[in-house]
């Protein structure tokens, strides 16, 4: 009985082996005939890229002059319309001139007396009728009288309060009949020059130092005369039609904010910009000749937090690659390293990607970088 069971077991072993081999062959056939997953890819194109930075700022007047009297007296008349444009040298107020007219008349009379005495002494000196000292005293008195008469004329002119600069004048702080004094603390009015107008913006010093390093290393090139041009957007999103020019930057860093103040000058013929307005200034930073841009959705992060992308190699196999993200540019990342021109990165079906698998790459849908539309891109610090 035992012998019969042993013979049967020997007969079943080859059959089981054959069955296992057939089953494995079927599994290999199924695996070999599996369809590769379809993924959307974006083909990277190196391109010239002009980088700009968006900085908040405020407008400030080109010139501001507070009008104060240089003569004392009763204000007789205001001679301008509040809020109107005034020209330099235009009369704004009239101070009662009668006191100064009398002082001028007395000074001119004293001048005439001193002049006649000096001329008379000059003739007497020729005949030795007076001493040289008497003649010198008479000449000094004449010159002093000339100076006093000139001062009286100046004070007389000061009764007419003139506009110190051309610009728009604000409200009058005094009315007719008010007593004003020479050099008083309160201004009579303020004249503001609005054309051109300044825009002051603050740039973080870390960003400024990074740009300098990029320019020194050659990663960024200056864009010629356009680097000094500044574009402006109003607080409501309306673009300002005229370009400005970057004038200077402060030589010191604000300790509280760690930023440097930059000043730009804008033409303002229609007075659309008023002092104190909040605006956004777009400054040219530089140009990168062969910039590598990839869509935001192509970049992920691994468990260590390192930026990575899935790259489809020429044989359609997938590879995970670490990249260096420099900054965002519109709807894309500007890369410093990791991806080369012409390589394909996965933007759709990223969840299907695994290292080493074969995929079916197709052109990704609805993936367009802002720079490909020809619009000027905007850079933000990363």
From Swiss-Prot:
InterPro entries: CusB-like_dom_1, CusB_D23, MFP_Efflux, RND_pump_MFP. GO terms for cellular component: plasma membrane. Its main location: membrane. It is a lipid-anchor. Keywords: Cell inner membrane, Cell membrane, Coiled coil, Lipoprotein, Membrane, Palmitate, Signal, Transport. GO terms for molecular function: transmembrane transporter activity. The periplasmic linker protein component of an inducible organic solvent efflux pump. Involved in export of toluene and styrene but not of m-xylene, propylbenzene or ethylbenzene. Is not involved in antibiotic or AMP efflux. Belongs to the membrane fusion protein (MFP) (TC 8.A.1) family. This is Toluene efflux pump periplasmic linker protein TtgD. The gene is ttgD.
